[in-house]
Regions:
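Short, structured motif recognition centered on aromatic/hydrophobic residues
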Residues: 89, 127-128, 180
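Amphipathic alpha-helical packing segments from all-alpha helical-bundle domains
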Residues: 137-162, 170-182, 197-205
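Hydrophobic alpha-helical connector segments
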Residues: 80, 94-120
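Amphipathic C-terminal alpha-helical segment
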Residues: 117, 156, 170-194, 206-220
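Helix-turn-helix
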Residues: 34, 42-76, 80
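Amphipathic alpha-helical segments used for helix-helix packing
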Residues: 118-138, 155, 185
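Generic hydrophobic, amphipathic alpha-helix propensity
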Residues: 28-39, 56, 81-89, 93
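N-terminal intrinsically disordered/low-complexity leader segments
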Residues: 1-30, 158, 215-223
Length: 223
């Protein structure tokens, strides 16, 4: 399919089976997925600000009417893409860890995979980290929800012993996620997305330091 958005490299949201289906066999859910894929390709190629609804529907191979069956506007589509990408990121994190290793190694593996996935496309990454915040409260809510999912995953890995102590509480996990996000945002601002792998060591060290500090505080309890 010809498109003004070009061919870009990013982690797909479509399964190969769905991507190969003819238009007549595509159900409503797949139309939604195609629109998200179209949005992702266009944003990755030309940025969010320069992407139009016409670009999205052309890339998705659907009508403008179909777009408005799912989204009220372009910001709504970006929020949906952000949520889908967040779920994809969680899948990347889960598939990266080796359950036979300790939590320190598991988390480091997950962080490396996460940052590696982000670095695949700097423009799309900027939209999901920066442009989403320009959408006001709905964008902030979507970002907060994604951060909470990452924090929950982090706690799941660190606190994996059912009968063991709680090594990482909720507030501290969110603080670590916030710190990692700030490192990523700094890399975006400084045009160092290609070097995101350099953040694996400090991000992992931050988590270890927080866990160590939390265990050293007498009477520290979940709030």
């Amino acid at each position: 399919m010809d498109s003004g958005c070009g061919t870009v490299k990013y982690q797909t949201l479509l399964t190969p089976t769905i991507a190969a289906m003819p238009e007549t066999e595509i159900d409503l859910r797949t139309h939604h997925t195609r629109l998200l894929e179209g949005m992702a390709r266009c944003v990755a190629a030309q940025g969010y600000a320069d992407t139009t609804i016409a670009d999205i529907v052309r890339e998705a191979g659907v009508s403008r009417r179909t777009f408005y069956e799912y989204f009220t506007d372009k910001p709504g589509c970006l929020i949906a893409l952000h949520e889908a990408a967040s779920q994809n990121a969680l899948a990347v994190l889960r598939s990266a860890i080796n359950p036979d290793r300790g939590w320190e190694q598991q988390v480091e593996q997950a962080i490396a995979a996460y940052l590696g996935a982000l670095a695949l496309n700097p423009v799309l990454m900027r939209a999901l980290f920066v442009d989403i915040l320009g959408l006001g409260l709905p964008g902030l809510v979507a970002r907060r929800r994604a951060n909470q999912q990452l924090a929950d995953f982090m706690r799941e890995v660190v606190n994996q012993q059912p009968s063991g102590p709680v090594l990482l509480h909720k507030a501290m996990a969110m603080a670590v996620v916030g710190g990692i996000n700030e490192l990523v945002l700094q890399a975006i601002e400084q045009d160092r997305v290609a070097q995101l792998a350099d953040l694996v060591a400090p991000a992992s060290a931050l988590l270890r330091a927080v866990v160590t500090a939390q265990s050293a505080v007498p009477g520290f309890e979940e709030k």
